[in-house]
């Protein structure tokens, strides 16, 4: 699963969206994947239920969340969406987020061995959250992903398959 290609294939980069709370933020993050057929609507419900039970375990760094649920919760194909919000939303643990990268993985192996390294590579770029917030076009986001491809986290990964 290639982050850049998955975002292109699913037309799932959305910038400057509005959300009044964390549930709306998760909804606008997964909507592009529902629209593309990568996930079923119940995937959203599974994320909400899991968040309410375990807290927002998918906030990976200040300002950024990677909402996801288990593969059997409605994943049809491997996919990502990346959205930015106009305003910060506060999650149940008090953490604020303005960038969400939703992940749909058909297996836990893809999640840990392929998806996570690409996400780390992107978000380890200097000022990644501010830079993503400043992106005006999908092409701006894709250029940042391209910039991240030299990350040591991606060494040895076959991102073309």
PLM feature spans:
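Cytosolic covalent-transfer regions centered on His/Cys nucleophiles
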Residues: 1-161
């Amino acid at each position: 699963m290639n982050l850049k290609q998955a975002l292109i294939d699913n037309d799932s980069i959305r910038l400057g969206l509005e959300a009044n709370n964390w549930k709306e933020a998760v909804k606008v993050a997964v909507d592009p994947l529902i629209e593309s057929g990568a996930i079923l609507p119940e995937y959203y419900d599974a994320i909400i239920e899991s968040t309410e039970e375990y807290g927002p375990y998918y906030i990976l760094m200040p300002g950024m969340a990677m909402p996801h649920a288990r593969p059997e919760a409605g994943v049809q194909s491997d996919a990502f969406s990346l959205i930015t919000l106009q305003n910060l939303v506060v999650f149940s643990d008090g953490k604020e987020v303005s960038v969400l990268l939703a992940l749909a993985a058909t297996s836990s192996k893809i999640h840990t061995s392929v998806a996570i390294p690409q996400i780390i590579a992107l978000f380890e770029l200097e000022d990644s959250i501010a830079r993503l917030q400043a992106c005006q076009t999908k092409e701006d986001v894709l250029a940042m992903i391209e910039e991240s491809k030299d990350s040591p986290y991606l060494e040895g990964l076959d991102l073309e398959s």
